[in-house]
């Protein structure tokens, strides 16, 4: 086992990186923490990151760019007959929507619209005559 107290800052950094830990700058205030971390990493069994396996499709080419279809296949395979659908925002129910997309028969005053978009009513100033 390596004597961590005798390592230079560079060597300490190199050993930590080799064991899969990315340290910050090694300073007098952080060195003790990194020495302790190196001892922990040396004492524990080697850690291997999990291998991400690409899901296989039972039908069709794996090189296809049809990622949405692939996702639907995965969801159907996991939970039966679930399908994903793209939804759009229903602008007719949004009072802040543009006038041509609002529900017919509703009217908004300019002050209401400014309040909806700016979060507050504008100040009114009276111009002296």
Swiss-Prot record:
Q: Which Gene3D superfamilies match?
A: 1.10.720.40
UniProt-listed PROSITE patterns: LEM (PS50954)
Q: Where is this region: Disordered?
A: 45-129
Which is one Pfam family of this protein? LEM
Name-wise, this protein is LEM domain-containing protein 1
Bias kind Basic and acidic residues: ranges: 83-97
Q: What is the lineage of its organism?
A: Eukaryota, Metazoa, Chordata, Craniata, Vertebrata
Q: The LEM domain covers which part of the protein? A: 1-45
